């Protein structure tokens, strides 16, 4: 296709006998791969590149239609930008490390890690595949850490092939030569390099501190990974006693923590307890002496208004412990059970006996024992009363989190540094959020941070911290003086690799070294996706050129639910490392809801596998459903929308074939023979054709503005609305003239009028192929191949500009087409109400409309009469606004004043 001085030259191929959407995916996907249609060239400067930080989907089994939904939004923008002339950098990654992957591997192969076991090079898992069923830990075969990691790598490789096949079928215009795995060597090198630089600048640090702990997954959990869920429990009214035996009552939902109590806390303004501040009481059962203290965070209207502070029952306990410098009395282990040894602070013999009964028990079992003992001692006032409380859960867990003291790695994120917090708020203000109301979620999250980002995890399949520690003469690790590798050694696994100056024989012995065994949280790697895909800080020239042309990136598309995790953490990392935003724009997709308007998720079991609708309706139809939804808003899984999308794709094929076939008969009267065409806007001379071009110019302008603002659904709505009007009204109105068909009186349209119609049809359908290309890549590529053989893909063609359509319109109003369409609609209505064939002639008719409507209809009267088979008198009556108001007729409507039908055509005899 060439477009010089607004003339569009077309090379028309022979048209297929039958058209349809089935089979288009396989046909065009092969061509795109062979031609490198979506390959990133990287031959131009930064301004000519559009780079996308594509979300790497979590490799933990299967995708659902929610993924198809959000990734389609991104692909629409990628395709649009490519057609706008940008060299689009659109990579794909796989988030294949972390807890979701580990859990899938455990269930899929029926295994679990036992770090004490040696590596078995001949290990074969007991089975493969469990149809998503959870395998109990007691039934899982213990294997070494290395064997487990090998199984993780094997299964994720299988899953990634399936994911890629789905994305390709959906038509994502990914450059598949630009892929990465978050557990791969390059991402590991980036993650470790960034961490070492954070460490050198004092932004990463380790600390022994109380933190949230998931007893199921046996790992620490960050604030961003929390979910607050309603959890049933019981309030227990329990007596602490003064020296003289006088009781003071607290109410608690966790009596099993009585042995961990350090104090009683009340609000300093609570008149009920002011007299007791500074005094001491004894805990029930254990007889441990604890002070009564004041703290403003104590809630006067909650329970008894006075609470016990234990180490640790919840985050409030941590706050009180820290502010009031209370002792640490931990009794819960990392496995969620009570410690085996009776603590030294319990000195009372009877108290030590009670504790011994709870040792090694789960918190649930210990609670039952303690409540029974409180009844026996008389320290339980009444029976427990049921309650529901909001409790912290790990977002992927099913048990309430405990708070356990452990050594962990943290990264500064503004949670403890007011200056950094303010800087990250400012970064959020620099970022263009789409939709903009999502910005407040970012700001609320940053303002509400109460601690730095915990980035270490006590798991196995992840990026290792590139650290060792010296081991002193007593065999204890010196955590205050970590040993770091040089960057040119990265990536390293400290459990396998040896620090410089040491050898393997010195591992885990006095005077030697020991490895950091924790791994990085998966978000600690995912937060660096902009640096990973753009090859930040890599020494080779190709990587330097890639980084220069793609970073900072242009777009981060993602779900609204991970603003606090992925979006914020990526902003934090880029701010610390690159002193800038990682991208200029962020688009936030909503959730997909099931028919009951509940969020689709694998954990709820209400997901739809995307292969099903793609196979049934076609990729274009599924993309249409996804693209019709606005950013930031939830949408339902709607088969009806997919059917509309399929109908739209089929209509594009049929309408284009119909219009391109006009006037293309070879000597054997075969319709649609190969031909060349030049669609010159100057050849559009008829009023109706010019009106169609005027409307097209308006649509191109509105769609372009919407897509520039990342409003893909608004652009689709504008394009689709006019496409149907173009097909249902314009093509129907001009097809007789385009064919050169004589009217009912034998008058043949002029050559000029015929050319005007054919040119407008060509210009229009060429434009629609390009306008719909980001949404319906397969159907548009098919029709483009009929129009522009040999010119390459529609997805490398230029996005339409208004110039040729403005030139063709020469000042015409698009309203002329609207009025003409309404007039034809009334002519059809006359026949449908009379229950006669649409081919029935109208002997005479009078239509009324507002004066501007009459003027517009008159300008296209010949086309309207021929489309409606008006063979006789055709009168137009102008109505003033007052008349329309009196009759209750809208000023924008056309009405039938009088009509007379002729004889319906004779029915053809059946053979």
Curated annotation (Swiss-Prot):
A motif ('KMSKS' region) lies at residues 599-603. Keywords: Aminoacyl-tRNA synthetase, ATP-binding, Cytoplasm, Ligase, Nucleotide-binding, Protein biosynthesis. This is Valine--tRNA ligase. It is found in: Cytoplasm. One of its GO terms (cellular component) is cytosol. PROSITE patterns: AA_TRNA_LIGASE_I. Catalyzes the attachment of valine to tRNA(Val). As ValRS can inadvertently accommodate and process structurally similar amino acids such as threonine, to avoid such errors, it has a 'posttransfer' editing activity that hydrolyzes mischarged Thr-tRNA(Val) in a tRNA-dependent manner. Its EC number is 6.1.1.9. GO terms for biological process: valyl-tRNA aminoacylation. Monomer. Residues 882-911 are annotated as: Disordered. Pfam families: Anticodon_1 (PF08264), tRNA-synt_1 (PF00133). Transmembrane segments: none annotated. It catalyses: tRNA(Val) + L-valine + ATP = L-valyl-tRNA(Val) + AMP + diphosphate. ATP binds at residue 602. Belongs to the class-I aminoacyl-tRNA synthetase family. ValS type 2 subfamily. The gene is valS. InterPro entries: aa-tRNA-synth_I_CS, aa-tRNA-synth_Ia, Anticodon_Ia_Val, M/V/L/I-tRNA-synth_anticd-bd, Rossmann-like_a/b/a_fold, tRNAsynth_Ia_anticodon-bd, Val/Leu/Ile-tRNA-synth_edit, Valine-tRNA_ligase_type_2. ValRS has two distinct active sites: one for aminoacylation and one for editing. The misactivated threonine is translocated from the active site to the editing site. SUPFAM superfamilies: Anticodon-binding domain of a subclass of class I aminoacyl-tRNA synthetases (SSF47323), Nucleotidylyl transferase (SSF52374), ValRS/IleRS/LeuRS editing domain (SSF50677). It comes from the Bacteria. Its main location: cytoplasm. A motif ('HIGH' region) lies at residues 57-67. GO terms for molecular function: aminoacyl-tRNA deacylase activity; ATP binding; valine-tRNA ligase activity.
């Amino acid at each position: 296709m060439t477009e010089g001085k607004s003339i569009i030259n077309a090379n028309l191929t022979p048209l297929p006998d039958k058209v349809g959407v089935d089979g288009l995916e396989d046909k065009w996907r092969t061509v795109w791969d062979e031609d490198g249609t979506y390959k990133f060239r990287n031959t131009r400067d930064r301004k000519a590149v559009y780079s996308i930080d594509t979300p790497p989907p979590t490799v933990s089994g299967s995708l659902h239609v929610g993924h198809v939904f959000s990734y389609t939004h991104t692909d629409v923008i990628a395709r649009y930008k490519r057609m706008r002339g940008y060299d689009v950098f659109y990579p794909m990654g796989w988030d294949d490390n972390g807890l979701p992957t580990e859990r899938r591997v455990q269930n899929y192969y029926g295994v679990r890690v036992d770090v004490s076991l040696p590596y078995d090079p001949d290990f074969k898992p007991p089975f493969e595949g469990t149809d998503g069923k959870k395998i109990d830990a007691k039934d899982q075969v213990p294997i070494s850490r290395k064997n487990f990691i090998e199984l993780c790598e094997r299964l994720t490789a299988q899953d990634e092939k399936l994911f890629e096949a789905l994305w390709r079928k959906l038509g994502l215009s990914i450059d598949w030569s630009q892929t990465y795995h978050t557990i791969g060597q390059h991402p590991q090198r980036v993650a470790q390099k960034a961490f070492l630089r954070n460490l050198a600048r004092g932004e990463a640090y380790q600390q022994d501190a109380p933190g949230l702990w998931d007893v199921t997954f046996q790992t620490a959990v960050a604030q961003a990974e929390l979910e607050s869920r309603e959890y049933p429990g019981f309030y227990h009214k329990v007596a602490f006693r003064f020296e003289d035996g006088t009781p003071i009552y607290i109410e608690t939902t966790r009596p099993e923590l009585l042995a961990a109590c350090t104090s009683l806390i009340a609000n300093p303004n609570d008149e009920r307890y002011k007299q007791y501040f500074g005094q001491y009481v004894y805990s029930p059962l254990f007889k441990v002496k604890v002070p009564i203290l004041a703290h403003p965070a104590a809630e006067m209207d909650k329970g008894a208004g006075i609470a016990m502070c234990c180490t640790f029952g919840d985050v409030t306990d941590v706050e009180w412990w820290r502010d009031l410098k209370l002792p640490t009395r931990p009794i819960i282990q990392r496995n969620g059970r009570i410690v085996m040894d009776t603590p030294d602070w319990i000195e009372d013999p009877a108290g030590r006996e009670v504790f011994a009964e709870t040792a090694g028990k789960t918190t649930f079992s210990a609670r039952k024992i303690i409540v029974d003992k409180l009844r026996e001692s008389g320290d339980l006032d009444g029976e427990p009363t049921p309650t529901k409380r909001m409790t912290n859960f790990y977002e992927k867990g099913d048990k309430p989190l405990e708070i356990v003291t452990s050594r962990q790695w943290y990264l500064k994120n503004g949670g403890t540094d007011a200056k950094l917090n303010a800087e990250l708020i400012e970064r959020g203000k620099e970022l263009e959020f789409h939709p903009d109301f999502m910005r407040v979620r970012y700001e609320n999250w940053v303002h509400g941070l109460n601690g730095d980002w915990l980035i270490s995890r006590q798991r196995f399949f992840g990026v290792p911290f590139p650290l060792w520690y010296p081991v002193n003469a007593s065999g204890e690790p010196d955590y205050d003086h970590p040993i770091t590798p040089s960057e040119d050694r990265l990536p390293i696994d400290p459990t396998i690799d040896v620090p410089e100056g040491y050898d393997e024989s010195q591992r885990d012995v006095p005077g030697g070294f020991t490895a950091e065994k924790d791994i990085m949280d998966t978000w600690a790697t995912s937060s660096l996706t902009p640096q990973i895909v753009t090859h930040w800080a890599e020494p080779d020239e190709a990587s330097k050129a890639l980084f220069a042309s793609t970073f900072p990136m242009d777009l981060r598309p993602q779900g609204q639910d991970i603003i606090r995790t992925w979006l914020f953490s990526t902003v934090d990392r880029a701010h610390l490392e690159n002193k800038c935003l990682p991208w200029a724009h962020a688009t936030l997709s909503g959730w997909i809801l099931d028919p009951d308007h509940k969020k689709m998720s694998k954990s709820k079991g209400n997901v739809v596998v995307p292969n099903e609708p793609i196979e049934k309706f076609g990729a274009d139809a599924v993309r249409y459903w996804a693209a019709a939804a606005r950013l930031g808003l939830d949408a339902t899984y709607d088969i009806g929308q997919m059917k509309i999308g399929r109908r739209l794709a089929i209509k594009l094929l049929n309408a284009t074939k119909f219009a391109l076939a006009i006037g293309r008969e070879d000597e054997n009267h075969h319709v649609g023979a190969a031909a060349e065409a030049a669609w010159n806007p100057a050849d559009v001379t008829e009023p109706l054709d010019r009106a169609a071009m005027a409307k097209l110019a308006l649509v191109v302008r509105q769609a372009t503005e919407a897509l520039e603002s990342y409003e893909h659904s608004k652009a689709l709505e504008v394009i689709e609305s006019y496409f149907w009007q173009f097909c249902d009204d314009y093509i129907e109105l001009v097809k007789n003239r385009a064919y050169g068909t004589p009217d009912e009186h034998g008058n043949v349209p002029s050559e000029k009028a015929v050319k005007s119609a054919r040119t407008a049809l060509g210009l229009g359908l060429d434009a629609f192929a390009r306008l719909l290309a980001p949404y319906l890549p397969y159907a548009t590529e098919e029709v483009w191949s009929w129009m522009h053989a040999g010119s390459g893909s529609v997805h490398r063609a230029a996005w339409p500009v208004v110039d040729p359509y403005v030139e063709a319109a020469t000042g015409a109003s698009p309203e002329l087409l609207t009025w003409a369409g309404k007039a034809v609609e009334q002519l059809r209505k006359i026949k449908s109400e009379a229950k006669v064939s649409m081919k029935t002639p109208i002997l005479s008719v009078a239509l009324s409309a507002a004066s501007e409507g009459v003027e517009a209809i008159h300008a296209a009267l010949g086309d309207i009469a021929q489309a409606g088979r008006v063979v006789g008198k055709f009168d137009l009556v102008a109505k003033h606004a007052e008349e329309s108001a009196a009759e209750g007729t809208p000023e924008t409507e056309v009405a039938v004043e009088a009509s007379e039908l002729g004889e319906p055509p004779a029915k053809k005899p059946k053979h």
